[in-house]
Amino acid sequence: NMEGTIVIGEGEMDEAPMLYIGERLGTLNGPKFDIAVDPLEGTKFTANNEPNAFSVIAVANKGDLLSAPDTYMEKIAVGANLPKNLLDIDFGVEKNIKLLAKAKNKKISDLNVCVLKRPRHDEIVKVLTKMNVHINYIQDGDIAGVLSVIGEEPKNDIYYSTGGGPEGVLAAAALSCYGGQMQGRLVLNEEEKIRAKKLGIKDFNRKYNIDDMVRGDVIFCATGVTSGDLTKGVKDLGNEFEVTTFALHKSKKINKIITNIYNKWIRFQ
């Protein structure tokens, strides 16, 4: 008994048959929620049976999730237990890396930086290479890249790339449950600015901190399609499928893996 509104989905109403931005779900009575979804994060991974493809949803109270257009977003993300507002996109790569190394009491050469492997990041890579940090490239999967900075022994110290705007908000939902930090700024052409205006975005140069993207309590779930860093993939058990979900709830400090078994022959209406 709830009213959910899709704020991040499969596109605008004329682009998607379902889960479009603005679509309302539920009984339309009871509590109101924002819903952000990415039904398949990592389409290439799925097609090639490579790791880190999953289905993602985040749910927050009405008005608490940034409704980001399907455009690029500059992003930097780090884990928990660091000084607040430590990094800033406008500081530049070199200054941010030096600040991070000092805050983590690490040598710069011991830092691990996750970068989405794209030509647009060549300048970032040049600076990182000159600073002699470890660069861990990912081919796709922006959300998994951001989430590689979480945990007691994270794979990476920082995520530094320009990826999808909607994926940025979904990643911020999970990162906020861990007390991590993130900053993003939308990269918009003239046509995209028109779409952004429709979503209520007025300042096209605004830098969004994690509390701007996820303003309060949030639930985040990622269900594995292929096995990866977050979850196992779907497992065929003959007449059944085993499905694994990575679940977080910020206010209740829930962080757990949920495994469910589904009968292959049941059709969901």
Regions picked out by a protein language model, each given a short descriptive name:
Residues 1-3, 28-33, 41, 49-54, ...:
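Short coil/turn connectors at secondary-structure junctions
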Residues 1-62:
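Flexible, acidic active-site loops/lids enriched in D/E/S/T/G that coordinate Mg2+ and/or position polar
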Residues 54-55, 75, 263-267:
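A short local loop/turn or secondary-structure capping micro-motif enriched for an aromatic residue
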Residues 60-61, 65-71, 138, 185-190:
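Short, acidic/small-residue loops that bind anionic groups at enzyme active sites
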Residues 91-240, 244-249:
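An extended, acidic
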Residues 238-269:
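Extended hydrophobic packing segments that form well-structured cores
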